[in-house]
Amino acid sequence: MWGICIPAVCSSTAVSKLTKVMYESATLSSIPSDVTVKHCQEAGERTPYSTGFYIFIVLVLSLIATAVGSTYYRKHVPAAEQSTNYLIKIITKSFCMNNNQEDLTKVNKDEIHVLNGIRFLTSAIVISMHVIFYMSVAGISNLLDVDEFLEGVGGLLLHFDLFVDTFFTMSGLLHIKSLMKRRQSLLGVLWKRYIRLIGPFALIVFYLISVSKHYSPGPAWIGVDETDICEKHWVKSLLMMNSDVRHICHAVTWYLPCDYQLTILGTLLFFFYQRNRSFGFVSYAIVAAFSIVIPGTLTYLYQFPGVLFSEYGKYVIRYRDTWEISLIYTPFYSRASTYLVGVAMGYFMCIYKPNDYRKSVSKKWSIIGVAVSFIIMAATMSLGYVFKQRQYDPVEAVVVAATNRIFWAAAICCIIGMCEYGNVPIVSEILNWPVFTPLSRLSYGIYMIHPIIVQRHKLAQRSPHTFDTFCMVYDGFAILTMSIGLSYAMWLFVEAPLINITNQLFFDKSKEKEPNKSRNENGQGHQNGVTKNNVSLNKIELYKRNYENRIQHQNGVPKTKIL
């Protein structure tokens, strides 16, 4: 990125010519350049506050006030004196911060504890990757150091997108596990999943449209066009229908429609399984085959590299202008194989419940299984570096594109399985650390919030960034810490209340009619002309008399009752 300060009276044509001269002289380049001016930021220029800005501020303050008021009301007002109004009960119960705090730390029955550690650690890694991503978008001054890094150990990170496949694997596992746990409305399941995703997403979209332009100065931010894209395509994004990278509101949110569409696919497969077990398995096999064939076919037809980001500069720096991403990276069919591996693991864990088969795999084989999984993950991750060093081979590209995500997902599932069914000393203890339980539940908020922090930090600078490992690690930890704090606030004021309200309105089992107790208590139900209560009492008395008087013999010796 290059910046130049000139008098405000200069036209865009003049700016283009001056920038061209500056670029060619600074880089000592003889390559002809063509500079396009998208925006000139004028000193002292301020964007007027819109109505949406004030609505956003009022909305946030209202949510906070409602949460504080509900917490005080439920804590200090005696239950006998609390209002019986149904709406007030729902609001105060849903927004009570004490209840939401307990939900954040509560350990659920049959919870797969290792998933908490995997989910949070994956979120932390994704944040680190996005720090580098937005640095590249904003501009790096020492690009030779970047090239040297990618030629060395950094080349292992060229397939960094595999970390996102960990989320899809866990999503498939948990979704099928939830469906098989109890009988429930499948449409209700999809609705709950949508509500779970939409709350934080809608608030972030509202922020990007109405507020971000006032707090994100700098030419780099203007060039990202987040605000304009959100204003044009926010409806499609909120409906989980947007997988086109040119129209995605907030770059990292491509994950949401992809995940939700896969949730619909998983629910449909489960519906087939409910109707006919064999047809369900056949449907799963067909979809799994297509999830392998489609990425491989597209890679062959369009001659994509086996690992898309092995050509880092082409597919990252100008990601919105790269049509290949919308065809092979963000659509649900490109991640279906990973999701289906998770579905298979979830089905296995429902049939063979970990609580019933704990430590059934020996320590030796558990360690071997985890070690092999880590080796497979490292080998799969290194494919980006391998493809960067080799000439393009269409057969290799097709095979890798079709199968590499499956190996990654299978390795993740193997680690989960060995920790749940076996005995893995260090890995299991780390992933089962209790601190990961609340952090895992904040991971969705962390994922949604952290790009805003990274953008504000990286794109507000008016000079190119310096690529330095220590600085990136420092930025990663700082952004992770801020994201956790803001995600905690998002949970208390937005995410948990919205989930609670939905459960109260649509899935509250306490609203179901209770059986008529007076009927049973008064003995009005008759059976063959005799009240049911009398029949039950007669049976109990008869059983007691038989038990007291009977003498059981074994081998001719009476068996006495031991008191």
Predicted features and spans:
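Extracellular (lumenal) ectodomains and large extracellular loops of multi-pass membrane proteins
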Residues: M1-R74, V114, T122-M129, A138-G139, ...
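Interfacial loop-to-helix transition and helix-capping segments at the boundaries
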Residues: R46-L61, D110-N116, E151-V164, V224-K232, ...
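C-terminal "closing" transmembrane helix and its immediate cytosolic amphipathic cap
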Residues: L59-L104, Q391, E420, V424-F436, ...
